[in-house]
Design a protein with these regions (language model features):
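Active-site helix/loop module of the DD-peptidase/beta-lactamase fold
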Residues: 504-510
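C-terminal capping/lid segments that line or modulate ligand- or cofactor-binding pockets
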Residues: 5-27, 32, 86, 401-424, ...
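Aromatic-residue-lined binding/catalytic grooves and analogous aromatic/hydrophobic interfacial grooves
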Residues: 1-315, 328, 332, 336-470, ...
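Generic recognition of well-ordered alpha-helical segments
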Residues: 51, 253, 431, 485, ...
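The feature captures the catalytic groove of carbohydrate-active enzymes
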Residues: 260-262, 387-402, 450-500, 515-595
Length: 853
């Protein structure tokens, strides 16, 4: 099945390899092939906001919840999100010799190389595929190896055709894609042939349609061209494909196109593929070099793998320092006692172990690498944002394949900061800024307000509201939440060109909306207090507004006043805007606007707790907390925000810990457990954080490491839902949670190894990022050994919190660094010059500068 495929890609083009020895499929996809959307002009219903607020003030919340939605429906508004679809399938069928044995699939993440191999009649059959980063094309090699074999036994057929998913009933739009499909076969002698495929699809259309990147509306063709090059065999033209016989090796190169007229695309790709003369190995080497730079931009080793990494490094030193050989070798032998775990097992073994008990150290490390691998293969700074299925979704109507900004899009990108893949956020910023005109129209038409209102769900061709239900339409927090990503990118890059041309145009629009949207009242003591309504805590409903038990209604009444999340977003956003105003100069924004921002901040009250001691999800008493839910929106001040953390706010943390602990386990999803793990890491509770990741691996992980929304087996950790859709935000959230356990980074503050669990007790990381520098660490918690290297990227001042197991710290003296101890295990470090380096180490003699495992 496509859900079990081996994924590879270059961020623009993706390939999923699945099938078997008889019939193998390369599912070919691109970031920009979306279809079957509808974007209508948004009708002006802004007067509904006044009616809605009046009903809310009167306590008629259920009726008020539908006010704007009903106004849209009464005017016949019916926009529809697009679906992300594959471009084509390359289907390869091979005639068996005696039947397969020893079938094996593998994925080399370091080279982005997917492969399958098996034995048939003593012949080693091998298939390998990658997508070149040097030249945007898929490269696929088929080979058969056996000394003295009769090659006439080898026979393959190749077909390049429209994507079809067995069992999926065609809608009118799907049938139109199938009916428009065209194929052509060209053979140039016995050793070179071409397969050409084209179809057409309906783009998002409608009276108010905003097309993709100003491309010609009529340019709806998409397709692929594949070149087959045969070594020592011969090919034969078939009606809809090519037959290859007796080949030692077959090299297939494939180029894809979207929104390009068929004839010109076919000619362009035939010319470019035809001029390609490099071998598979040469093409792989040049692509892998580019891929490795991204894959190794940050690195992690755990347990035995950290030992082996240190051993390799030590081995290099040993060659230079023969006199120390015996001691170091013996040290590594002894250290094996700390890491008694067999490594190198199959995914199936690792996943079964996680299902039966808990994750191994090997699985934790592999999942961290795999999430990053999918991220760099599934998007790029110049492409669309990473979608929930990456580039590997295998249906025409994938469930929830759009860009969803009430959790999922944010989770996909959280890891990119610490993980040193910061530039990938540019895909989100370009995507959102291109849609600012649409978001401003949304704000005017729905609310009668200037500025930006971004509906939570969008696709490349549809920026207007689509999911016309109260839980989506009435939530105005999406744009403010994404503003956090804009602001953090600036903190990490200090790029003033970006600030003026990208960040400020977006954040200024968000500020303009909130300035008009907020209302004020006074509390019992005469202090001004904010009223933010309608306000939604994403997808949750207060328990006192839930229907009677046994009656199932999706999102029955989400529309409230002053949800904790909305107020958290508002507080964070305007604090950041005040900082931005100082950076660009206070005269950049009118003084009256800055005064309004300060007024809003002053009017946001301290967040209150309920009778159980948990921070309230809605700050108004008429809304009661509901724990049977997956979203953790009201924990925003702890994560993904930085407002509350243990060292700064020890008195506040308990209320947030209590709120998380009350969430019911059978209401969770793959992504919510990753989110919860990151929260527990912020609480400095490594045990609970890892328990969440264990639960995620137990309930939402396929054998190819794709993650799902929920368990598909009717178990009791996640919610039950059929189908259980692929959602790759969970694996990205997993990466982030592991990083949060190893490094906490807030502006001007970092905590080293803040939330270790026993399976993270031995490890090494390199080039983890905080806003102004790079952190590399080695540690062995059991031996109380620790080493940290901090490399600044610019002069700055930062507080550094040492790990709990480090009783004292030492550092190398340098004129470029000023260090002061603030309190136990907390230092304030000022880097006076760029490119200096500070080294902290503990637990060995000064002459021994390495952690011994």
């Amino acid at each position: 099945m496509w859900r079990e495929g081996l994924a590879t890609g270059n961020g623009v083009t993706g390939v999923s390899l699945y099938g078997g020895a008889k019939r193998e499929i390369l599912q070919l996809g691109r970031h920009d092939l979306w279809y079957d959307g509808l974007e209508e002009e948004v009708p002006d219903v802004h007067e509904a906001l006044g009616r809605q607020r009046k009903k809310m003030e009167e306590g008629s919340f259920r009726e008020a919840s539908w006010e704007i939605v009903n106004a849209l429906k009464e005017k016949g508004y019916d926009s529809r999100l697009e679906s992300h679809i594959p471009v084509a399938n390359l289907v390869v069928e091979q005639t068996p010799i005696k039947g397969f044995r020893s079938f094996r699939r593998s994925l080399d993440m370091e080279q982005a190389l997917a492969s399958q191999q098996w034995l048939d009649g003593g012949v080693l059959m091998r298939r390998e595929v990658f997508v070149s980063r040097a030249v945007d094309m898929a490269v696929y090699r088929l080979s058969a190896e056996k000394e003295g074999m009769n090659r006439d036994l080898l026979e393959y057929t190749f077909q390049l055709s429209v994507f079809r998913n067995e069992g999926e009933r065609p809608t009118e739009a799907i049938q139109a894609v199938w009916d428009a499909a065209q194929t052509e076969v060209v053979c140039e002698g016995e050793h070179t042939g071409y397969l050409l495929f084209n179809s057409r699809r309906e783009k998002a259309a409608g009276a108010g349609s905003r097309q993709y990147d100003n491309k010609d509306v009529s340019a709806t063709d998409f397709g692929a061209v594949a070149k087959l090059s045969v070594e020592e065999g011969r090919l034969e033209k078939l009606e809809n494909g090519i037959k290859v016989k007796a080949a030692k090796e077959i090299l297939v190169t494939i180029g894809l196109y979207v929104d390009e007229e068929r004839a010109s695309a076919w000619q362009r790709l035939r010319d470019s593929l035809g001029s390609q003369t490099k071998t598979f190995g040469q093409l792989l080497a040049e692509s892998a070099k580019l891929h490795k730079a991204l894959y190794h931009s940050a690195e992690l080793w755990l347990g035995q793998d950290a030992v082996q990494a240190a051993g390799r490094e030590e081995g290099q030193k040993v060659n230079r320092e023969e006199g120390q050989k015996a001691n170091r070798t013996e040290g590594h032998k002894e250290s094996r006692k700390d890491t008694q775990e067999e490594w190198g097992r199959t995914n199936e073994d690792l996943v079964l172990e996680a299902f039966s008990d808990r994750q191994s150290v090997e699985l934790i490390e592999k999942l961290w690498h795999y999430g990053r691998y999918l991220f760099i293969c599934g998007s790029s700074p110049a492409a669309n944002p990473f979608p929930l299925y990456g580039l590997w979704g295998g249906r025409y109507r994938l469930q929830w394949c759009h860009n969803m900004a009430n959790e999922n899009l944010q989770m996909i990108y959280w890891h990119s900061l610490c993980g040193n893949l910061i530039e990938y956020n540019q895909a989100v910023f370009r995507y959102m800024n291109d849609r600012i005109p649409a978001f401003k129209e949304n704000a005017r038409k729905l609310f009668g307000i200037d500025g930006i209102y971004m509906t939570a769900g969008t696709t490349p061709g549809v920026s207007s509201p689509t999911q016309v239900v109260p839980v989506i339409i009435n939530w105005v927090g999406a744009a403010g939440w994404l503003a956090q990503h804009y602001y953090q990118y600036f903190l990490y890059t200090r790029d003033m060109g970006y600030a003026r041309n990208v960040m400020i145009p977006y954040m200024d629009g968000v500020a303009g909306f909130y300035e008009e949207f907020v209302r004020f009242t006074t509390d019992g003591e005469g202090r001004e207090r904010i009223l933010f309504y309608p306000s939604v805590s994403p997808e949750n409903t207060p328990v006192n507004f839930m229907p009677p038990e046994g009656k199932r209604i999706a999102h029955p009444m989400p529309t409230t006043i002053n949800s904790t999340m909305d107020l958290s977003i508002l507080k964070e956003f305007f604090k950041n805007m005040l900082t931005v105003s100082q950076i660009v100069g206070e005269d950049f924004f009118p003084r009256e606007r800055i005064e309004k921002w300060n007024r809003i901040l002053k009017a946001i009250p301290e967040f209150r707790s309920n009778g159980e001691g948990a921070v309230k999800e809605w700050q108004e008493d008429m809304f009661e907390d509901r724990y049977d839910h997956r979203h953790l929106s009201h924990i925003y001040p702890v994560f993904p925000g930085h407002e509350v953390y243990p060292e700064k706010d020890p008195g506040k943390i308990h209320a947030y810990e209590k709120a998380v602990s009350l969430r019911k386990i059978d209401a969770q999803t793959g992504w919510s457990m990753a989110h919860m793990a990151a929260i527990y890491a912020r609480f400095r509770n490594g045990g609970k954080a890892m328990e969440c990741l264990d639960n995620m691996a137990r309930s939402s992980l396929l054998n190819n490491f794709f993650t799902l929304h929920n368990d598909w087996r009717g178990m009791n950790i996640s919610l039950n839902m059929d189908p259980a859709p692929v959602q790759l935000d969970a694996i990205m959230g997993y990466v982030n949670a592991v990083q949060e356990m190893i490094l906490y980074a807030a502006p001007g503050y970092i905590a080293l190894l803040p939330a270790l669990e026993e399976r993270l007790s031995i490890g090494e990381v390199r080039n983890f990022r905080y806003s102004d520098g790079l952190v590399s660490m080695k540690w062995n918690q059991g031996r109380k050994q620790f080493e940290c290297r901090i490399t600044p990227l610019r002069p700055h001042k930062v507080q550094i919190v040492l790990p709990d197991f480090v009783e004292q710290g030492k550092w190398q003296e340098t004129d470029a660094v000023s260090i002061a101890a603030l309190r136990e295990k907390v230092w304030e470090v000022e880097f006076l010059e760029g490119e200096s380096e500070m080294v902290v180490f503990y637990g060995w003699n000064a002459g021994n500068d390495t952690v011994e495992y």
